[in-house]
A protein has these predicted regions:
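Amphipathic, Lys/Arg-enriched alpha-helical "gate/interface" segment within cytosolic domains
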Residues: 1-149
């Protein structure tokens, strides 16, 4: 089975960047969360910045409710999760996910603007688009990739 995400950790920015492909499955999501909780940066409280701009807008709302259940139940205090989308439909679907993903110590917000998400996470302006150098749709959909920057 192929998975549909790639992870890049930038410890200097205290941030985990995740780029999602078009059609993740619930199994992809489960594997992502298993990988995420194993990262030292996650356990240390790094913020998470998810690029969901390629996400297919035809996934049912029930997918996002179920996917949120796979996430860790005990995030580090003060962690933030930014969800970046590219359409109004995706914005609404990720709001559903955000509602179910909220935990004490974890702030979740949905953005349709890269700069607003970057500012909310406290990332410097000079980083540009942190997902630009990550794998495009085809490589992301072929395998999971975790790398350190």
């Amino acid at each position: 089975m192929t998975s549909r995400w790639a992870i890049s950790v930038d410890e200097s920015l205290n941030c985990i960047f995740v780029k999602w492909g078009r059609n993740p499955s619930l199994e992809d999501t489960r594997q992502y969360f298993e990988t995420l909780v194993g990262l030292p940066a996650f356990r240390a409280g790094a913020h998470m910045f998810n690029d969901l701009r390629a996400l297919a807008p035809d996934l049912p709302a029930s997918f996002f409710r179920q996917a949120a259940r796979f996430g860790p139940t005990t995030p580090a205090a003060g962690q933030k999760l930014a969800l970046l989308v590219s359409s109004e439909v995706a914005f609404g679907l990720m709001r559903i996910f955000a509602t179910f993903r909220q935990r004490p110590g974890l702030e979740v917000d949905v953005f349709d603007d890269l700069e607003q998400a970057r500012k909310w996470l406290g990332l410097p302006a000079d980083i540009g688009d942190p997902f630009e150098d990550m794998a495009d749709d085809n490589p992301v959909s072929d395998s999971n990739r975790t790398e350190a920057r």
